[in-house]
């Protein structure tokens, strides 16, 4: 999901997305530990998705506007 799409979401939607993505990361790490993960790059993708959501939430806290 792109940052532009995230910025169009409400705070409630972003927090839900963050919780869902963290849960997905937990499941991927568990699969990795048990040797069942097919694509290890999925962990990196999910971590970046979490970072994007957190960045948008923090921007809103600080009142940063984007054109």
UniProtKB/Swiss-Prot annotation:
CDD domains per the UniProt record, alphabetical = Ribosomal_L29_HIP
The answer on whether this UniProt entry bears the keyword Amino-acid biosynthesis reads: no
Q: InterPro entries, alphabetically?
A: Ribosomal_protein_uL29, Ribosomal_uL29, Ribosomal_uL29_sf
One GO CC annotation = cytosolic large ribosomal subunit
> Which ranges form a coiled coil?
none
Record keywords, A-Z: Ribonucleoprotein, Ribosomal protein
One Pfam annotation, family name? Ribosomal_L29
Give GO terms: molecular function aspect only: structural constituent of ribosome
One Gene Ontology term of the biological-process aspect is: translation
What protein family does this chain belong to? Belongs to the universal ribosomal protein uL29 family.
| Protein name per the record | Large ribosomal subunit protein uL29
State the species of origin: Desulforudis audaxviator (strain MP104C)
From the broadest rank down, the organism's phylogenetic lineage runs:
Bacteria, Bacillati, Bacillota, Clostridia, Thermoanaerobacterales
